[in-house]
C-alpha cells in the first residue's frame, strides 16, 4: 500500500511541476522583454527625445509590456490592429533591401543611412524584426478581442496622429504626419492629418481587424 501511495503521489505532483516550470519560463521571458524595452526606450530618449516614442511601432513596443504581464487579449488586439500590417511591410522592405542591395519602397531608408549611428540602426532592427512575431504570438496565446481591437486602434490613431503633427517637424515626420516618406504634403495640416487618419482606418486597421478576427477570435 505504501508503494502504491508513493507512486500515486509522484504522478499527481508531475502536473504541478510542469505548471511551475511553465510559470518560471513565462516569468523569465516577461522580465527579459521588459528589460529590453527599458534599454530601447533609454537609448531612444538619449538620441531622439521623447517625441520619437509617438511612432506607432514604439507605442506597440512599449504597450506589449503590460499586454504580456496582464496576458491581456484587449491590449494585444489593439496593438496588433494598429501596427501589425505596417510592421510586416517594414520587414519585407528591409529584407528585400538587404537581398537586392537596392532601394525598394523607401520605408526603411533610414536603416541604410551611413551618417546614422550603427547602434541606433541595430537597436531599430532588433525591435522591428521580432515585433510582428511577438504580436502574433500574443494573439495566439490570449486570443483576439474583435470587439475592442478595431475601435481601440481607431481611438489610438485619433489621439496619436494630431499629437504627432503638433510636436513633430517635416524633418522628423513622425507617423508620416508631414507627408508619406520623403514627400511633403502641401495640404493644410488639419486636412492632411484627417486624410491620413482615414487612410489608416480604411487601408490598415479594417483589413487587419478582419484578418485577425478570422484567425484568432477567442
Task: Name every feature range the model reports, one short phrase each.
Residues 26-39, 201:
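Alpha-helical transmembrane segments
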Residues 35-41, 58-67, 131-137:
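Hydrophobic, membrane-inserted alpha-helices
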Residues 36-42, 84-93, 156-166:
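Aromatic-anchored segments of alpha-helical transmembrane domains
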Residues 42-50:
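Short, hydrophobic transmembrane alpha-helix segments
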Residues 49-70, 74, 79-80:
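Loop-to-helix transition at the N-terminal end of transmembrane alpha-helices
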Residues 80-85, 89-155:
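Membrane-proximal helix-loop-helix units in multi-pass membrane proteins
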Residues 166-207:
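Membrane-interface transmembrane-helix boundary segments in multi-pass integral membrane proteins
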Residues 210-218:
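Juxtamembrane boundary at the C-terminal end of a transmembrane helix
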Amino acid at each position: 500500500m505504501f508503494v502504491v501511495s508513493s507512486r500515486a503521489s509522484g504522478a499527481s505532483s508531475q502536473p504541478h511541476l510542469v505548471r511551475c516550470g511553465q510559470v518560471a519560463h513565462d516569468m523569465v521571458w516577461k522580465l527579459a522583454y521588459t528589460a529590453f524595452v527599458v534599454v530601447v526606450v533609454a537609448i531612444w530618449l538619449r538620441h531622439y527625445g521623447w517625441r520619437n516614442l509617438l511612432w506607432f511601432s514604439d507605442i506597440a513596443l512599449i504597450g506589449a509590456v503590460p499586454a504580456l504581464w496582464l496576458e491581456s487579449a484587449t491590449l494585444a488586439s489593439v496593438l496588433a490592429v494598429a501596427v501589425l500590417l505596417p510592421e510586416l511591410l517594414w520587414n519585407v522592405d528591409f529584407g528585400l533591401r538587404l537581398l537586392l542591395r537596392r532601394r525598394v519602397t523607401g520605408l526603411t531608408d533610414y536603416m541604410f543611412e551611413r551618417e546614422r549611428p550603427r547602434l541606433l540602426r541595430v537597436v531599430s532592427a532588433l525591435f522591428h524584426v521580432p515585433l510582428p512575431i511577438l504580436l502574433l504570438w500574443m494573439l495566439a496565446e490570449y486570443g483576439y478581442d474583435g470587439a475592442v481591437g478595431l475601435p481601440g486602434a481607431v481611438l489610438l490613431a485619433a489621439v496619436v496622429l494630431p499629437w504627432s503633427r503638433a510636436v513633430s517637424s517635416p524633418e522628423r515626420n513622425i507617423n508620416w504626419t508631414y507627408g508619406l516618406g520623403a514627400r511633403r504634403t502641401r495640404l493644410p495640416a488639419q486636412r492632411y492629418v484627417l486624410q491620413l487618419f482615414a487612410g489608416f482606418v480604411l487601408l490598415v486597421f479594417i483589413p487587419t481587424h478582419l484578418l485577425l478576427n478570422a484567425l484568432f477570435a477567442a
